[in-house]
Amino acid sequence: MKRKTSKIVTLSTIGGALLVLMTGVQIAASIQSANLDLLFPGDQIITDSGEGLDGNYINYEVKSQDEALKKAQDMTQLTAEEGMTLIKNDDNALPMASTTKVTILGYYSWHNNMSGGEDPSNTTGAISLGKGLANKFQTNEAVTNLYASVNDDFADPASKLDTVKGTFSEYDTAVVTLKRNSGEGNDQSLDIGASENHRTGLTIKTNELKLLDYASKNFKKVIVVINSANTMELGFLDPNDPNMSADGIYTDPYNTGATYDLSKIKAAIWAGCCGSQGGTALANILDGTVNPSGHLVDTYARDLTKDPTYKNFGSYKYSNSAELNSYQDETFFVEYEEGIYVGYRYYETAAYEADKENYSGFNYDTSVVYPFGYGLSYTSFSNEYEGAPTYDEKNETYSFKVKVTNTGSVAGKGVAQIYVNAPYTKGGIEKAHVVLGGFAKTKMLQPGESETVDIEIKEDYFTSYDYKNEKCYVMDSGYYNFYLSDDAHSWATIDNESDTEKAKHLYTRYVSESKIYKDGKTGKRVTDKSVATNKEDDELNWKFKEYNEGSVGDGYIHNFTRANFKDSFPTSPTGNDFVMSDERAKKQVAKYNVWDEENNPITEMPETNTDKTSYTLADMRGVDYDDPKWDDYMNQFTVDSMVNMFSNGGWNELEDAENGVPKSFDADSPYGYYAHALDIKNVNKWYCGDPMVAATFNTTLAKELGECFGEESYGNKLAGGSLITGIYGYGLNTHRSAFGGRNYEYYSEDPVLAGKMAAAEAGGASEKGLVTFMKHYALNEQETNRQKNGYCSYVNEQAFREVYNRGWEIYIKEAEMEINYYNTDSNGKYVMSKKTMPAATGIMTCYNRIGARWGGASDALFGILRDEFGYTGTTVTDAGGQPNTYMTTDLMLRKGGALTLTNNGTNGLYDTESATAIYYLKDATKHILYNKANSNIMQGIAPGAHVSYTISPWKIWLYTGWGVIGGLVAIDAVFIALIAFNKIKIKEKEVKVSANGSDEEEF
């Protein structure tokens, strides 16, 4: 009997275990359903397509994935060739003859940055800098093999390189690569330690100086390649550096007892973020196949520790974090005390004030090695204004014609830059001495050839913002000077030119009356949708005082002012700066209660789930955002459907088959497709980083690059992979500090250059069907503490609007795409038509806070981006909102968010029933669908079409698993029943036998 009982227990245990196992699998699958749909999607079925229409809206050029990859690699090479920037070329050291014999020095010549910190040696099809040179020149294989045997640069180069020194006599030239890399969560170090005498991570290191010294002593000519998105201190390249002797002996400023022979360094080229084909591009430039035409996108300061941002970059923690709504009792902050004076805006203004004897102790030449916009060529160019520029009063726009002439002996491309100087009154609105107004790049010009390029400058982009007094944009009266420049410092030369020469390079316009962009006479700025007034008083402006109002460490930020640069120079936080005491800030970090009356201003329940129209999403392609047709279409969605689309936006945006909405897939990143569970085939993972794109100063090329991204998505589909619709890029944050960990994802220190390039690149990508989630809005200029409860970013509203928001403004206002869509003719027949629509299709918000409020729920989203700029794109979070912490999903929804970068259900969205919640759910869903309708996900889907999907394979496997387990459990149950039945029978028999035995004993 015990054996049978044991069998029942065993079988019951097995059956129970199988049920528990399958239940666990079911729960896990339910939680990860979106990810499983990414990996194992069902097939799309399109039905009811109207009138035999094919729905081929996008004209793709590629016919295969291989063709798309080749196109992408060619575009990457072209971008690098136009963006790499020649910064030094003494004695015409470059170009080199193709017969030059080259020794390549530096481990990172073969392990350079393509974009961020990726190593090309680990990427199929990539050409490292070293490999590119080896493909072009005869290179020293002994040295190459030596570096192949190690995994870093040599601490003592001489001790290692002496082993192959016997080969040097055959080689005249050494090419040395210096690299810096950073990445997400990884800023450049402000101090790399005592062993390096506490120099920064962007200062040349001891072993690098030793390597350059070794190269100078063993080769006739040394070429330096700078492979870094972060601006390094490059004083060692400057013969006029205070630490450089006349004969090229350099004294290390961090170790004054050490000197190095750098006399043979004759040329240097910036090659940061050069993409998968950067090696080929570099080799083509070095031998003159390509004439370099890139220009620097940042100012190269001689000593970064003296930059205005240096004292307020890094880790600063509130001492009363435990009192706040803080994860692990940690809340951090960053103070943008420098205000508008970022990059060249500081250095050029400081130079002017010093020249006027208003800034003692500042010397431009000892502060700046290479100015913003600087770049050399193998030829020379002359620029001059051609005719008088025009000013369009209605559109408040200047139009310039610039004649660019190749005055040298080889073909090349020239860049014209125009900087605007606005009138400044001491003590008035802060103004940089010059700001970039516009730029243009020529075609390839032969020697002696000229081209006239058009440069348009919108007044809106250099108008000042007065956050203190008028609390709006202000155009002061006075003289406005437009400098036709080679770089940001050209104004200093032009001011001293003869009248004849000055007329070629300087245009001045007098504005007799100030414009206050809120009064009845002036109204809003021309490009704005509504009047712009202070939106950030509670989040930002309250935190700022004048430099002489109070004392350092009083808990406020003291404005850096041109009126007294020296005494107002930024300082590090101290004292009460580390205490969050203001009630406005405390309210912003407090837990958000979605049920408070103030958070539910809408009382009338919006329409949902109405009788269906005949519209599907294909009918909405090409329909303007404000068209009433959208109201009819949106009213037919259920709340559940809208919640699903809003809450599941992580790499996989959900479908609504009933309303003709297909599912779509999104991918990282700004420089190539990164999988995240998507089916990505053999793509060009590493395009050039955004700084390299910006360095081309070529918006036409940027648009072609965006188109190439779209072609690759289509190519991936042709190969059986995912059709990518959304990309988490490009990057529009500002190079506030050289130490920013993600500078490789962002274009520049200048918002006009960044905004123009982003608008062009997004326009190209969107025309090929992509939704570009430009990231990270806003103030994500450092990585330190970014994900630790989101650091609080404090910047006054003037700097926020003029520096950190302007790139986004230009992207929203200027990015355009031409789409194809079906319209009806006079007979009611569908005809394919063309239309220009906004290409600012998406934005990704940030982890950090704007002020003390999470940036993903900032007042700036609705108040500035939508209300003022007219933004109609889809806004997605950077990762998901989190319940009861600072990334609050309900607040994000109410502030203009449209998607959460999660795929795990509602993820903290508590309110899905109130009128306010449903109103904003409809608004969010409309933004999602408006941009989907004009994307590649509609390719092949004509008006009237319905979309459905076969069941995902993983669900079939799950159901099959349940069937198998169910069958096994059923069999198990039968066996248990049989055993139990048999046991009962045996028991009955035993009882009967026992009973019979007793009778026999009694008789």
Give residue spans per PLM region.
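Terminal connector regions
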Residues: E459-T527
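Glycoside hydrolase catalytic-domain context in secreted enzymes
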Residues: M1-D466, V474-Y483, A488, A532-F1003
